[in-house]
Amino acid sequence: TLYYFLFKCLYHFDKDIFMKRNHLIYLKIMDLLKDGAFNRSSEYHTFVFSSLSLKEVQSRYVVLRNFIEKNHNLIFFTDKRSPKVKSIIKNNLTECLFYDKFKKIQLRIKTKSFILRDNTEIRKYWDKVPLESRKSYSTKLAPSSIIDNKNKCNEKEYLSDKNDFSNFCVVENYIREIDFLSLITDTHERMKIIIENNQIKIKELIP
């Protein structure tokens, strides 16, 4: 039809098109992230989270604890006293890097990060944290504290079990943009997916 012809012409002209949530690459990425959140053996269960602190980029590995597909929200846990929390509060434009060395798929994801403040929701996540893992949130010294002679004796001291929840922090990372790169074939495939106001815009890129 004429409409289909015009559609194809527009698509091939600028390789830039608004898509619904049924695009194959988009659906593939959603499946990878969902699997990463609930499958410990997934290559997407851990990722590199980068934030800006004092004009320097700081990167660290974190564990993907949940992925809420409806609002494209990546969740990880941390200690609220950690430097990354301070960085997010000052500048919440962040980036998440995933890579599957077997499937050779890289996801560079630009995010906007927030500290979850809803105590009811925080408690739901806390209840799922294994008892042996909760202890990591109960050190008397904050993460990244320098160990010297003064506080060496406190290095392995912990707060009471009743207080460790106070240091537990849930970080929400809302996806703004995904750079998808597949290196599995001779003709590498790369796409940029922009998510804005619940609309999905896809651009084909040179790998």
Features from the language model and the residues they span:
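Charged, gly/pro-rich active-site loop segments
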Residues: 20, 106-207
